[in-house]
Amino acid sequence: MGVNADGRARYRSVYAQTREEVIAKRQAAEAEILAAKTRKRPTEFNLLIIGAGTHGRDVYEIARSLHVFRKISFLDDSVQGENIIGRCSDLLKYRSQYPCAFVAIGDNKLRRRYAELLREYNFLIPSIVSPAANVSGMAQIGDGVAILPLARVGDAELGDFTIVASNGVVNSSAVLGKCCHVDCGAIVKKEARVKDGTWVKSGEILG
């Protein structure tokens, strides 16, 4: 960093700041970055995931990578492990601590059952979309939708609580109903109409 006789730092062709001013601004910027990393997020960004199985863990990793949620915990009836704070029947008990909730259960009927409870209890219901998925900016994505890494979604419509698994493909102009599941490697063709609760199995081509 060059300076002139007055001690002003050279920025391109202009001597605009003293060395001390440059250092002070740099230190202030570094302090702000550190503060942003450690700043507590409000309680409304706590997320409760219903289901701690394989799909639940996938959703957890995506949600964590988004750096949106302050705290992420699970409810599960059969799995014991880290971050599991209670059973699925405890859902209402945690409403005040975890305003956001997501149903991460692969079974379409069971997922729909808990989805109805989230509505009844007035949870905020985010969609969880992996940054590693290829999703059109024109896609219409409902509440509680999970789109996993390497999935591809065109200019399509995904109903509430639908899952598009890794390497699943939903082509443009397709319309999926609520609580559908496009499994790994499954393809929903262009302009297909998919009924609520449909499971498109791995390797299947629908439409």
PLM regions with names:
Residues 30, 63-67, 118-120:
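Short, solvent-exposed amphipathic alpha-helical segments in soluble enzyme
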Residues 21, 54-57, 109-110, 140, ...:
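Short alpha-helical
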Residues 79-134:
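Phosphate-bearing ligand-interacting subdomains
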